[in-house]
């Protein structure tokens, strides 16, 4: 019982009571501004819509308004006359949300560092490597090729904003910060603006995106931590009480009656967690639960997850959000890649005395490919080509210098080769490179009021040498032995640990 309480109750180092004063510090908003610029920098080099009116003068005005306690006593029925944000309501609300998101991430960052320090003789890992999107793919390569079925799950969202506050309350023991969070959510936000459910999945509103992503991820993390705890401690929980477990599930709610009802059915459902080979991955509002079990086994997991999230976490969920697929004959959009598990047939000649025969050894392999249609769609949306992939000029860049135009196109091309370096077949990337190169030439020709052929003949082909330094040539210089031939570079898959966000061209939607 004490072991369960130690897991469910955070220690004193994880309970922070000093977060609220940070909302009045100027450097917090500077950190949030820097984070926002780095996060919103798109691979297409377009303006991401971040408000350029940010300045320390506005920060000082905002802090002065918040420091006056009379402005914090606000009627929820009279939001239009609220003097707190004044005429800059949109800008101030965005700044508060980004600053608050930067502050409340502190407890989770401390928890991450403390958990990483327990590995490899108390040596702290480089957490920025674990943040890389590409760090997920080696895990899938090592584990998914041995599994049979996978549950593709669209993660549900909470039905009320107060649930988000109650979730964060478990980790942040700071009443002032939580009151500010509750005020901000109910006064300036609503569930419709937070989550747009027009698509089968979900999407967050672009305004205050970092703030809402943090709230949503903290809530899903709470659900997942309880789920993983049940999975790892199934044999131990058979002989223990479940009061502390339910207390955490319901976030300090009144659950005396539920304890009795849940305890009766708990022994029946607990055997489901005895699967020794189970892997879970979450990404982009979706998750994957892969197992070596059979189809009936995965079907039981499906209905258990629906009941688990819907009954115990107040999440709107139905069976249509979970699909059972066989890994050997199913492809999925995963982090901008088209991933699948395919069979590679290896023929081995064996000889016994005078007789020889061939042995066919099928080997499962996790494969990642570049999706050409979504990529061309993203390029067409950014006005680099038509919907059919025919290159066109970029008129909005015609006012830039020739070097700036070439640099922008070259940077996009290098970023694409960098992100999709994990693909086993890079032929698609050379088609994208051709589109960008010809689009660059047409943009330059449009600027100089000339045709593409005339412009290249007058300027020389060396003007577009920016595109010749592709990812493969960089790899051949970095790994001369492994990349001694062009075919070896073409077939090799390289995963990087410096890619922290997905941009427009890498979005599976």
Curated annotation (Swiss-Prot):
Keywords: Chloroplast, mRNA processing, Plastid, RNA-binding, tRNA processing. It comes from the Eukaryota. It is found in: Plastid, Chloroplast. One of its GO terms (cellular component) is chloroplast. InterPro entries: Domain_X, Maturase_MatK, Maturase_MatK_N. GO terms for molecular function: RNA binding. One of its GO terms (biological process) is RNA splicing. Belongs to the intron maturase 2 family. MatK subfamily. Usually encoded in the trnK tRNA gene intron. Probably assists in splicing its own and other chloroplast group II introns. This is Maturase K.
């Amino acid at each position: 019982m004490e072991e369960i309480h130690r897991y469910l109750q955070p220690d004193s180092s994880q309970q922070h009571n000093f977060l609220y004063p940070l909302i009045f510090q100027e450097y917090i908003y500077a950190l949030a501004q820097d984070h926002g610029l780095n996060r919103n920098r798109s691979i297409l080099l377009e303006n991401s819509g971040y408000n350029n009116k940010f300045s320390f003068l506005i920060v000082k005005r905002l802090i002065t308004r918040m420091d006056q306690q009379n402005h914090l006593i606000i009627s929820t029925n009279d939001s239009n006359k609220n003097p707190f944000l004044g005429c800059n309501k949109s800008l101030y609300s965005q700044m508060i949300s980004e600053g608050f998101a930067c502050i409340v991430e502190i407890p989770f960052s401390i928890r991450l560092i403390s958990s990483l320090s327990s590995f490899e003789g108390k040596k702290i890992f480089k957490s920025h490597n674990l943040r890389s999107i590409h760090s997920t793919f080696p895990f899938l390569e090592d584990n998914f090729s041995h599994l049979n079925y996978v549950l593709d799950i669209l993660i549900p969202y909470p039905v009320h904003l107060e649930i988000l506050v109650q979730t964060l309350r478990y980790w942040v023991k700071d009443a002032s910060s939580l009151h500010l969070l509750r005020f901000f959510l109910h006064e300036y936000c609503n569930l419709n603006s937070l989550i747009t459910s027009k698509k089968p999945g979900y999407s967050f509103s672009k305004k205050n995106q970092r703030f809402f992503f943090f709230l949503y991820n903290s809530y899903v993390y709470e659900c997942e931590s309880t789920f993983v705890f049940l999975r790892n401690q199934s044999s131990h929980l058979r002989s223990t009480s479940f009061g502390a477990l339910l207390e955490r599930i319901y976030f300090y709610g009144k659950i005396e009656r539920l304890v009795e009802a849940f305890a009766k059915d708990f022994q029946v459902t607990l055997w489901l967690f005895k699967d020794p080979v189970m892997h879970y991955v979450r990404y982009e509002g979706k998750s994957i639960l892969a197992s070596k079990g059979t189809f009936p086994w995965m079907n039981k997991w499906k209905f258990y997850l629906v009941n688990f999230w819907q009954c115990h976490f107040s999440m709107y969920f139905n069976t249509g959000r979970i699909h059972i697929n066989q890994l050997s004959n199913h492809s999925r959009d995963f982090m901008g890649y088209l991933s699948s598990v395919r069979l590679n047939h290896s023929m081995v000649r064996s000889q016994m005395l005078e007789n020889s025969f061939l042995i066919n050894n099928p080997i499962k392999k996790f494969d990642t490919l570049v999706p050409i249609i979504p990529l061309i769609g993203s390029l067409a949306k950014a006005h680099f080509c038509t919907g059919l992939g025919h290159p066109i000029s970029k008129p909005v860049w015609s006012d830039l210098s020739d070097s700036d135009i070439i640099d922008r196109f070259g940077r996009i091309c290098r970023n694409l080769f960098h992100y999709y370096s994990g693909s086993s077949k890079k032929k698609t990337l050379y088609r994208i490179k051709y589109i960008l190169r010809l689009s660059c030439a047409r943009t330059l020709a449009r600027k100089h009021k000339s045709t593409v052929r005339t412009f290249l003949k007058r300027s020389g082909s060396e003007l577009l040498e920016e595109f010749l330094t592709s990812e493969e040539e960089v790899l051949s210089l970095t790994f001369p032995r492994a990349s001694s031939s062009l075919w070896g570079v073409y077939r090799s898959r390289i995963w990087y640990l410096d890619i922290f966000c997905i941009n427009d061209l890498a979005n599976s939607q």
